[in-house]
A protein has these predicted regions:
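Small-residue-biased structural context
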Residues: 1-173
Length: 173
């Protein structure tokens, strides 16, 4: 199923990003300086690639169709699980950006802690979240959606990926 294959491939990129975020946190803990611009680049990737591009496809296409077609099990899984975790990731990214801005004005230990806390929290959240999607959500969709619904997911995913703004953002990252 093309739509899910793309999402799984994007997960691989996001996992690598999460490794980089944790490495950045370790570097700060080991006494290296905080690079606020690097932190802001991480936020840009998180908001653009992981959230807008990847979560956008999930929320606007796959999850939407699952909610329409697969009943209360999908409703609980998507609304009470995946969407809540997407929102938690957004919170971490917003808090991380605010911490980087504060650190530039006041390079205190507290602001450094907020950078580490939100970067590591985001990476941990996304790694666990990706496991749930790959092992539970996507397999449920592949098993339970009709052939027609799978074709709809694939077609809408291709259209999303062909959007010029989305193509430009994928090329950027």
């Amino acid at each position: 199923m093309y739509g899910i294959e793309i999402l799984v491939d994007e997960h691989k990129n996001i996992v690598e990003f999460c490794k980089s975020m944790k490495s950045m946190c370790c570097s700060i803990i080991e006494g290296n300086e905080v690079d606020a611009n690097l932190v802001k680049e991480c936020v840009a990737f998180g908001k653009t690639y992981a959230d807008h591009l990847h979560h956008g496809k999930e929320e606007k296409i796959l999850f939407k169709i699952m909610l329409e077609k697969l009943g209360p099990v999908a409703d609980k899984l998507i609304r009470n699980g995946m969407l809540v975790e997407h929102d938690l990731g957004r919170l971490h990214m917003n808090e991380l950006l605010e911490a980087a801005d504060r650190y530039e004005k006041d390079p205190s230990t507290l602001n450094k802690l907020d950078i580490i806390t939100n970067a590591a929290g985001y990476a941990t959240l996304l790694n666990r979240h990706i496991g749930k999607e790959d092992e539970v959500v996507y397999t449920f969709a592949e098993r339970a959606l009709s052939a027609e619904d799978k074709e709809r997911v694939d077609a809408e995913t291709k259209a999303f990926d062909e959007d010029p703004e989305n193509k430009a953002n994928v090329a950027k990252y």
